[in-house]
């Protein structure tokens, strides 16, 4: 594919995101690029995304290795992932442009479409996304929700020891403990994302939840649950109850949730006329600020650690300071390793 890179829209610690135009079709693309020697996770994301084909997953358009200027480092060998352009930004953007939250009718629509995307990657591809949240779900040209940012995703079969990755506020109890992370963890994150859409806020709020350590400990070891918004209908609360089961094996699957009364026969017409600033898409700076480097720990002693030490690892212990306030769209996902 021949394409021309446009304006730089955002930078993370390893990647730069630009708009681009395909010469042959004139299609606007989103291009995520990293220096080749630092592109391991971008290549992993490209490998996973290239295997997917669903209207509820952001579209893969290709990948390339080129020699070009990169940041202020002069000319460098660059790895680029080309993706579909989504004109209405993220669900977080949609909430912001609509007064800070999304009405329940559209929450139903978006939730159903997220689950259709998860049903596809879970059942047909054996993939867990591992970082479902509002800022990782885009709104496409026809108003449909599309799962994006597969940087934390992994294959769940066969079960291979993998780092636990994701955003602390959306982590399931088993992931918060650093034990495992699979399809069930995505379902927990769907519940948290519904709360985020309805309230316009992270699923954990209040003076007791001002840092990731507190939330990880209380979710992983004290068994606490996010508070359900009182404005929700009983059906919505029941739906969230099926997502936010403490035991992973008790959570409903994506397929089961698609048949829950909260979602059945309630999808409204596709949203049109959304207010947007150009360019607003998968290339938005808000979306791409979450591009980070993996933080790794030696796996050999993980299970020998006391639970307090394991929470320390989960809170970026060692060389990253945990801020006192949350930034859901910033540098707030973590990596831990286990045997």
UniProtKB/Swiss-Prot annotation:
Which effects follow disruption of this gene? More vigorous root growth, decreased abaxial stomatal index and increased stomatal aperture. Reduced induction of RD29B and RAB18 expression in response to treatment with abscisic acid (ABA). In the double mutant map3k17 map3k18, impaired MPK7 activation mediated by ABA.
Q: Where in the cell is it found?
A: Nucleus
Q: What Pfam families does this protein map onto?
A: Pkinase (PF00069)
**What upregulates or represses it?**
Strongly induced by abscisic acid (ABA) in the flowers, leaves and root tissues. Accumulates in response to osmotic stresses (e.g. mannitol and NaCl).
For the modification Phosphoserine, the affected residues are 301
Record bears the keyword Transcription: no
Q: What is its main location?
A: nucleus
Enzyme class label: transferase
Q: Which domain of life is it from?
A: Eukaryota
Family annotation (Gene3D superfamilies): Transferase(Phosphotransferase) domain 1 (1.10.510.10)
Q: Which GO terms describe its molecular function?
A: ATP binding; MAP kinase kinase kinase activity; protein kinase activity; protein kinase binding; protein serine kinase activity; protein serine/threonine kinase activity
What residues sit in the active site? 131
Q: Reaction catalysed by this chain?
A: L-seryl-[protein] + ATP = O-phospho-L-seryl-[protein] + ADP + H(+); L-threonyl-[protein] + ATP = O-phospho-L-threonyl-[protein] + ADP + H(+)
* Segments forming domain Protein kinase: 3-263
Statement: the UniProt record of this protein carries the keyword Transcription: no
Q: One GO cellular component term, please give it.
A: nucleus
Q: How is it modified after translation?
A: Autophosphorylated.
Return the EC number.
2.7.11.25
Q: Which GO terms describe its biological process?
A: abscisic acid-activated signaling pathway; negative regulation of stomatal opening; positive regulation of abscisic acid-activated signaling pathway; positive regulation of leaf senescence; protein autophosphorylation; regulation of stomatal complex development; response to abscisic acid; response to osmotic stress
What are the UniProt keywords, alphabetically?
A: Abscisic acid signaling pathway, ATP-binding, Kinase, Nucleotide-binding, Nucleus, Phosphoprotein, Serine/threonine-protein kinase, Transferase
Protein family per UniProt: Belongs to the protein kinase superfamily. Ser/Thr protein kinase family.
The annotated subunit structure for this chain is:
Interacts with ABI1. Binds to MKK3. Associates with SRK2E within the nucleus.
Q: What does this protein do?
A: Component of the abscisic acid (ABA) signaling pathway that acts as ABA signal transducer in the context of abiotic stresses. Triggers MPK1, MPK2, MPK7 and MPK14 activation in a MKK3-dependent manner and MPK6 activation in a MKK3-independent manner. Mediates the ABA-dependent activation of the MKK3-MPK7 module. Positive regulator of ABA responses leading to the induction of gene expression (e.g. RD29B and RAB18) and involved in various responses including stomatal development, stomatal movement, inhibition of germination and root growth. Promotes leaf senescence.
Name-wise, this protein is Mitogen-activated protein kinase kinase kinase 18
GN (gene name): MAPKKK18
């Amino acid at each position: 594919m021949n394409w021309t890179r446009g304006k730089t829209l955002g930078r993370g610690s390893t990647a730069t995101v630009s708009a681009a135009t395909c010469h042959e079709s004139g299609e606007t693309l989103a291009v995520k690029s990293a220096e080749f020697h630092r592109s391991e996770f971008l290549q992993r994301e490209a490998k996973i995304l290239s295997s997917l084909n669903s209207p509820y997953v952001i579209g893969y358009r290709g990948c390339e290795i080129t020699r070009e200027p990169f940041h202020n480092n002069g000319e460098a060998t660059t790895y680029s992932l080309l993706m579909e352009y989504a004109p209405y930004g993220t669900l977080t953007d949609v909430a912001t442009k609509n007064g800070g939250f999304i009405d329940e009718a559209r929450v139903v629509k978006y939730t159903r479409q997220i689950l259709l995307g998860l049903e596809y990657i879970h059942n047909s591809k054996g993939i867990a996304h591992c970082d479902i949240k509002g800022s990782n779900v885009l709104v496409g040209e026809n108003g449909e929700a599309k799962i994006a940012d597969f940087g934390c995703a992994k294959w769940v079969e066969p079960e291979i020891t993998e780092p636990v990755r994701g955003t602390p506020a959306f982590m399931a109890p088993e992931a918060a403990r650093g034990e495992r992370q699979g399809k069930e963890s995505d379902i927990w994150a769907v519940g948290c994302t519904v709360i985020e859409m309805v309230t316009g806020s992270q699923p954990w709020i209040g003076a007791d939840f001002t840092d990731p350590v507190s939330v990880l400990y209380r979710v992983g070891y004290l068994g606490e649950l996010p508070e359900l918004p009182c404005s929700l209908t009983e059906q919505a609360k029941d739906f969230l109850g099926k997502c936010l089961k403490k035991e992973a094996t008790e959570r409903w699957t994506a397929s089961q949730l698609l048949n829950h009364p909260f979602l059945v026969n309630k999808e409204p017409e596709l949203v049109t006329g959304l207010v947007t600033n150009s360019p607003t898409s998968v290339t938005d700076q808000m979306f791409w600020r979450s591009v980070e480097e993996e933080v790794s720990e030696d796996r050999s002693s993980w299970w020998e650690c006391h639970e307090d030490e394991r929470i320390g690892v989960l809170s970026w212990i060692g060389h990253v300071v945990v801020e006192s306030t949350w930034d859901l769209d910033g540098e707030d996902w973590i990596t831990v390793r286990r045997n």
